[in-house]
């Protein structure tokens, strides 16, 4: 399977590799075909290829809401996503706020929403939010105290859930 995938990854048309989505789709089709032909699950094929075993425990899957962060967060909560929502916070004015207020309100809403919609009090997703350097953009990439204070505010807004912030600043 890896051999097939490596050879497919190198196919070029007009001197360019095929688009990532095409390569991904074909690799999934190959994996699915190998699994079905050998009466195994796709995860078993991957485990065999890499000399490992299939996990007995659920693996936390990272989810991504895109710009429809409110509706998609609801879907993630109802499906029990372990890591959510990514949120695509890539614009200061529209998504973060000039003082970070838009994101802070969203994190508060997210915490309240999980507590309202979850079916099990043990459901404690990790909030993972990618901010694409926008926190550094509003506070200044050298203003570590202000960024740290804001991150602490976000952490408080997320309680009782854990919060991960991806890419707080571009340096």
What residue spans do the PLM features occupy?
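Metal- or metallocofactor-binding catalytic centers and their adjacent structured scaffolds
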Residues: 1-40
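Residue-identity detector for threonine
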Residues: 1, 20, 52-53, 63, ...
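Generic structural signal for short, flexible, solvent-exposed coil/loop and linker residues
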Residues: 15, 50-51, 70
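Metal-dependent enolase-superfamily TIM-barrel catalytic cores that perform enediolate-based chemistry
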Residues: 56-171
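Short alpha-helical segments and helix-capping/turn motifs at coil-helix boundaries
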Residues: 28-29, 42-48, 65-68
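Broad hydrophobic/π-residue packing in well-ordered secondary structure
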Residues: 31, 43-45, 135, 146-147
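Extended, Lys/Arg-enriched charged tracts that mediate electrostatic binding to polyanionic substrates
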Residues: 34-38, 42-47, 51-55
């Amino acid at each position: 399977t890896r051999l097939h995938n490596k050879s497919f990854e190198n196919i070029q048309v007009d001197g360019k590799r095929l688009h990532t989505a095409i390569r991904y789709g074909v690799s999934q089709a190959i994996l699915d075909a190998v699994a079905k032909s050998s009466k195994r699950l796709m995860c078993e094929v991957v485990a065999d290829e890499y000399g490992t075993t299939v996990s007995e425990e659920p693996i936390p899957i990272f989810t991504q809401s895109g710009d429809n962060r409110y509706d998609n967060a609801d879907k993630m909560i109802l499906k029990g996503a372990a890591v959510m929502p990514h949120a695509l916070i890539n614009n200061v004015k529209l998504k973060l706020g000039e003082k970070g207020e838009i994101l802070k309100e969203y994190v508060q809403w997210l915490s309240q929403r999980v507590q309202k919609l979850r079916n099990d009090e043990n459901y404690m997703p990790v909030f993972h939010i990618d901010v694409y350097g926008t926190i550094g953009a509003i506070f200044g990439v050298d203003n570590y105290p202000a960024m740290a204070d804001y991150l602490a505010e976000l952490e408080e807004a997320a309680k009782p859930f854990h919060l991960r912030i991806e890419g707080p600043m571009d340096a």
